[in-house]
Amino acid sequence: MEHIDGKILPVSLEMLGEARRLFDDYNARYSSNEKVVAVILGNDIKDYSKELIEYGADVVVCADHPELKDFRNTIHTKVISQIALDKEIASKIEPNYAKQFKKPRYIFFAADSIGRHLSSTVLVELESGLASDINKLVIKDLNVTHQIKTDGKPTDFKKTLEMYRPDFSGFLWTTILCLNNTTPAIKREYYPQGCSIIPGVFEPIKPDPKRSGEIIFYEPKIEENDLKVKVLSHKIIKSEVDFEIRKAVVSFGRGIKDAPDENIKLVAELAKQLDAEIGISLPISKKLLPASQSISSTYMIPARVIGTSGSKISPMLYVAVGISGAMQHIAGMQDSEFIVAINPDENSPIKNECDIFINGRMEDVIPLLVEELKKQQQVVQAG
């Protein structure tokens, strides 16, 4: 569970909420009573534990130590791995399960700057696999045939975590599985089934102050050799773009490709008339289109990305210009109150996501919209 300046980060509560929903269903289907365990590291963090229980944790494992005050990947990896493998903790969480305990069944991290580092190193320590940047989770029983993992034979895999993320096209789901090898020559287990979860994808549950749970205080085993890196100071770097202060957002995508500079200037003029912030789709941030340096450095930057790889927004008005509607982009703007899309492809997927779809080229449509907006402003000013 990530936290900063006295607050648990939203993505941690989002993950906890999804874990709660998954395990309420899991325990009902499998007639079990397995627990959702939240692990939190830091210094002077005891007060967080009750909040995590209110947000869905059955058990909170709290590692409170002065050397855990600031994030250091080496130490945090070591302590989380210690906790994950500790049979004494397992016996406190579920005595009946402790004898057969080896590793947790599942483990979730945030797909943010800290979680992306931490998830990879922890899963290496636990000798399992990692699915990154996940948008959807399902637990089910599967029957799988795989040439290597099952020696080409149909094999049952119980309580398997299906981890979903958009494929490289952005329009189809990729399902990632972390399965044991059952082939005799290479037989081995892969636990926990782990993933990092995109912030903003899941919703926290409503906190329940009356909810009860168990708090376990863990004494981390930190040695002098773990302290080679010292954190001297830290500061929060504010984003170059703040979507929250504007009621409207105008975004553009690869539809600008025929004339990047000219088309981006059109988008900027429309945004100006709407008093809107400017966003972009993920491919634009890769700077693969031949735009000028001034245009590229101003508009084609990661801070403007809308979607699961960027910002999740909910303005009163969202205008998508030349954006086809990949799933990862839709996830970032679908909470907008009113959505307008401008696209020459009448079969573009974004057509199904908007309130108004304008089938046309941006070069033709935007000048007409700008002209009409100017007329309306003149009427307002005259009145």
Predicted regions and their residues:
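N-terminal glycine-rich FAD/FM-binding segment characteristic of electron-transfer flavoproteins
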Residues: 1-383
